[in-house]
Design a protein with these regions (language model features):
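Glycine-rich phosphate-binding loops of nucleotide-dependent enzymes
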Residues: 1-217
Length: 217
Protein backbone atom coordinates (compact mmCIF):
# COMPACT_ATOMS: atom_id res chain seq x y z
CA UNK A 1 0.00 0.00 0.00
CA UNK A 2 2.76 2.42 0.95
CA UNK A 3 4.70 1.69 -2.22
CA UNK A 4 1.57 2.00 -4.38
CA UNK A 5 0.72 5.48 -3.10
CA UNK A 6 4.32 6.65 -3.31
CA UNK A 7 4.50 5.42 -6.91
CA UNK A 8 1.37 7.36 -7.85
CA UNK A 9 2.78 10.46 -6.13
CA UNK A 10 6.01 10.16 -8.10
CA UNK A 11 8.10 9.40 -5.03
CA UNK A 12 9.08 5.88 -6.14
CA UNK A 13 10.12 4.53 -9.51
CA UNK A 14 7.96 1.73 -10.89
CA UNK A 15 9.43 -1.31 -12.62
CA UNK A 16 6.24 -2.64 -14.17
CA UNK A 17 2.50 -2.62 -13.73
CA UNK A 18 -0.64 -0.93 -14.99
CA UNK A 19 -0.78 2.83 -15.27
CA UNK A 20 -2.92 5.11 -13.16
CA UNK A 21 -4.71 7.50 -15.47
CA UNK A 22 -5.86 11.02 -14.73
CA UNK A 23 -8.62 12.39 -16.96
CA UNK A 24 -8.67 16.18 -17.21
CA UNK A 25 -11.79 18.28 -17.68
CA UNK A 26 -11.23 18.33 -21.45
CA UNK A 27 -11.26 14.53 -21.53
CA UNK A 28 -7.53 13.98 -22.03
CA UNK A 29 -6.00 11.07 -20.12
CA UNK A 30 -2.51 11.17 -18.67
CA UNK A 31 -0.39 8.59 -16.90
CA UNK A 32 0.64 9.54 -13.38
CA UNK A 33 2.74 6.50 -12.57
CA UNK A 34 6.32 6.96 -13.71
CA UNK A 35 6.24 10.75 -13.53
CA UNK A 36 7.98 12.94 -11.00
CA UNK A 37 6.01 15.28 -8.70
CA UNK A 38 7.08 18.20 -10.90
CA UNK A 39 5.84 16.46 -14.06
CA UNK A 40 2.54 15.65 -12.34
CA UNK A 41 2.06 19.33 -11.49
CA UNK A 42 2.79 20.29 -15.10
CA UNK A 43 -0.14 18.09 -16.15
CA UNK A 44 -2.37 20.35 -14.10
CA UNK A 45 -2.87 17.73 -11.40
CA UNK A 46 -2.99 19.22 -7.90
CA UNK A 47 -2.08 16.11 -5.93
CA UNK A 48 -2.26 15.97 -2.14
CA UNK A 49 -0.85 13.07 -0.14
CA UNK A 50 -1.50 12.10 3.48
CA UNK A 51 1.11 9.36 4.05
CA UNK A 52 1.00 6.71 6.72
CA UNK A 53 4.26 8.07 8.16
CA UNK A 54 2.99 11.37 9.55
CA UNK A 55 6.24 12.87 10.83
CA UNK A 56 8.63 11.02 8.55
CA UNK A 57 7.03 12.14 5.28
CA UNK A 58 4.05 14.36 6.08
CA UNK A 59 5.19 17.00 8.54
CA UNK A 60 8.43 18.29 10.06
CA UNK A 61 8.27 17.59 13.78
CA UNK A 62 10.64 20.35 14.91
CA UNK A 63 8.71 23.02 13.00
CA UNK A 64 5.56 24.63 14.33
CA UNK A 65 2.12 24.28 12.74
CA UNK A 66 2.44 27.57 10.82
CA UNK A 67 5.77 26.61 9.27
CA UNK A 68 4.35 23.25 8.22
CA UNK A 69 1.57 25.12 6.41
CA UNK A 70 4.23 27.20 4.65
CA UNK A 71 5.98 24.09 3.37
CA UNK A 72 2.82 22.97 1.56
CA UNK A 73 2.23 26.39 -0.01
CA UNK A 74 5.74 26.71 -1.36
CA UNK A 75 5.65 26.38 -5.16
CA UNK A 76 9.20 27.24 -6.13
CA UNK A 77 9.45 30.89 -5.10
CA UNK A 78 10.44 32.57 -1.87
CA UNK A 79 7.29 34.51 -1.00
CA UNK A 80 5.92 31.70 1.15
CA UNK A 81 8.97 31.88 3.40
CA UNK A 82 8.70 35.64 3.88
CA UNK A 83 4.96 35.98 4.41
CA UNK A 84 3.49 34.16 7.39
CA UNK A 85 0.02 35.71 7.49
CA UNK A 86 -1.71 33.30 5.09
CA UNK A 87 -0.10 30.17 6.60
CA UNK A 88 -0.90 31.47 10.09
CA UNK A 89 -4.54 32.04 9.14
CA UNK A 90 -4.69 28.54 7.65
CA UNK A 91 -3.09 26.99 10.74
CA UNK A 92 -5.56 28.73 13.04
CA UNK A 93 -8.49 27.70 10.82
CA UNK A 94 -7.40 24.04 10.92
CA UNK A 95 -6.94 24.20 14.69
CA UNK A 96 -10.47 25.57 15.06
CA UNK A 97 -12.30 23.49 12.45
CA UNK A 98 -10.64 20.17 13.30
CA UNK A 99 -10.48 20.84 17.03
CA UNK A 100 -6.72 20.39 17.24
CA UNK A 101 -5.57 20.35 20.86
CA UNK A 102 -2.49 22.59 20.99
CA UNK A 103 -1.27 25.55 23.07
CA UNK A 104 -0.99 27.64 19.89
CA UNK A 105 -0.24 27.54 16.17
CA UNK A 106 3.41 28.16 17.05
CA UNK A 107 3.74 24.89 18.94
CA UNK A 108 6.21 22.39 17.38
CA UNK A 109 4.28 19.56 15.77
CA UNK A 110 6.33 16.93 17.63
CA UNK A 111 4.76 18.11 20.89
CA UNK A 112 1.25 17.22 19.71
CA UNK A 113 -0.44 13.87 20.25
CA UNK A 114 -0.54 11.47 17.31
CA UNK A 115 -4.19 12.20 16.66
CA UNK A 116 -3.65 15.95 16.60
CA UNK A 117 -0.65 15.57 14.30
CA UNK A 118 -2.93 13.67 11.93
CA UNK A 119 -5.56 16.41 12.05
CA UNK A 120 -2.95 19.03 11.12
CA UNK A 121 -1.68 16.92 8.22
CA UNK A 122 -5.12 16.05 6.81
CA UNK A 123 -6.31 19.63 7.21
CA UNK A 124 -3.30 21.03 5.37
CA UNK A 125 -3.59 18.65 2.43
CA UNK A 126 -7.33 19.18 1.99
CA UNK A 127 -6.92 22.96 2.24
CA UNK A 128 -4.79 22.93 -0.93
CA UNK A 129 -7.91 22.15 -3.02
CA UNK A 130 -6.49 19.03 -4.70
CA UNK A 131 -7.77 17.34 -7.83
CA UNK A 132 -6.36 14.04 -6.53
CA UNK A 133 -6.25 13.34 -2.79
CA UNK A 134 -4.48 10.24 -1.47
CA UNK A 135 -4.91 9.32 2.19
CA UNK A 136 -3.42 6.37 4.07
CA UNK A 137 -5.10 5.47 7.36
CA UNK A 138 -6.25 9.09 7.92
CA UNK A 139 -8.12 8.39 11.18
CA UNK A 140 -5.55 6.17 12.87
CA UNK A 141 -5.12 7.43 16.43
CA UNK A 142 -8.25 9.60 16.38
CA UNK A 143 -11.29 9.28 18.62
CA UNK A 144 -14.72 8.47 17.17
CA UNK A 145 -15.89 12.08 16.83
CA UNK A 146 -12.65 13.19 15.16
CA UNK A 147 -12.77 10.18 12.84
CA UNK A 148 -16.23 11.06 11.60
CA UNK A 149 -15.08 14.65 11.12
CA UNK A 150 -12.33 13.42 8.79
CA UNK A 151 -14.75 11.10 6.96
CA UNK A 152 -17.08 14.06 6.42
CA UNK A 153 -14.22 16.12 4.98
CA UNK A 154 -13.33 13.31 2.57
CA UNK A 155 -16.95 12.98 1.44
CA UNK A 156 -17.09 16.72 0.80
CA UNK A 157 -13.96 16.42 -1.33
CA UNK A 158 -15.71 13.76 -3.42
CA UNK A 159 -18.74 16.03 -3.80
CA UNK A 160 -16.45 18.78 -5.08
CA UNK A 161 -15.12 16.46 -7.78
CA UNK A 162 -11.85 15.49 -6.13
CA UNK A 163 -10.58 11.99 -6.90
CA UNK A 164 -9.96 10.42 -3.48
CA UNK A 165 -7.73 7.36 -3.06
CA UNK A 166 -8.38 6.03 0.44
CA UNK A 167 -6.25 3.34 2.07
CA UNK A 168 -7.79 1.76 5.15
CA UNK A 169 -8.33 -1.49 7.03
CA UNK A 170 -11.89 -1.14 8.38
CA UNK A 171 -14.16 -2.88 5.87
CA UNK A 172 -17.28 -1.13 7.16
CA UNK A 173 -15.66 2.26 6.56
CA UNK A 174 -14.36 1.27 3.13
CA UNK A 175 -17.80 0.09 2.02
CA UNK A 176 -19.41 3.26 3.36
CA UNK A 177 -16.92 5.72 1.83
CA UNK A 178 -15.68 4.18 -1.40
CA UNK A 179 -17.29 4.00 -4.83
CA UNK A 180 -14.83 1.27 -5.82
CA UNK A 181 -12.65 -0.92 -3.64
CA UNK A 182 -9.40 -2.43 -4.90
CA UNK A 183 -8.13 -5.35 -2.85
CA UNK A 184 -4.42 -6.21 -2.74
CA UNK A 185 -2.57 -9.18 -1.32
CA UNK A 186 1.22 -9.57 -1.28
CA UNK A 187 1.59 -6.56 -3.56
CA UNK A 188 -0.82 -7.89 -6.18
CA UNK A 189 -4.31 -6.77 -7.12
CA UNK A 190 -6.78 -9.57 -6.38
CA UNK A 191 -10.01 -7.79 -7.25
CA UNK A 192 -11.93 -4.56 -7.74
CA UNK A 193 -15.50 -4.36 -6.48
CA UNK A 194 -18.31 -1.79 -6.43
CA UNK A 195 -18.34 -0.18 -3.00
CA UNK A 196 -22.09 0.41 -3.21
CA UNK A 197 -22.92 -3.28 -3.57
CA UNK A 198 -19.88 -5.06 -2.11
CA UNK A 199 -20.24 -7.41 0.85
CA UNK A 200 -17.63 -7.96 3.53
CA UNK A 201 -17.41 -11.69 2.84
CA UNK A 202 -16.80 -10.96 -0.85
CA UNK A 203 -13.93 -8.63 0.04
CA UNK A 204 -12.63 -11.15 2.58
CA UNK A 205 -12.34 -13.82 -0.12
CA UNK A 206 -10.37 -11.43 -2.33
CA UNK A 207 -8.04 -10.66 0.57
CA UNK A 208 -6.99 -14.31 0.69
CA UNK A 209 -6.32 -14.60 -3.04
CA UNK A 210 -2.96 -14.00 -4.67
CA UNK A 211 -3.86 -13.71 -8.35
CA UNK A 212 -3.59 -10.67 -10.60
CA UNK A 213 -6.72 -9.36 -12.26
CA UNK A 214 -6.98 -6.93 -15.09
CA UNK A 215 -8.75 -3.65 -14.62
CA UNK A 216 -8.32 -0.02 -13.78
CA UNK A 217 -8.70 1.33 -10.27
Amino acid sequence: QKELLESIAGLQQTVKGSSILYKSKNGEESQLVGKSPKEIRKLGVALSFVPEDRLGMGLVGNMDIIDNMMLRSYKGGHTAFLERKAPKDLANAIIKDLEVVTPSAETPVRRLSGGNVQKVLVGREIASNPTVLMVAYPVRGLDVNSSYLIYDLLNKQKEHGTSVIFVGEDLDVLIELCDRIMVMNSGKVTGIVDGRTAKKDEIGILMTKNTDVEGKA
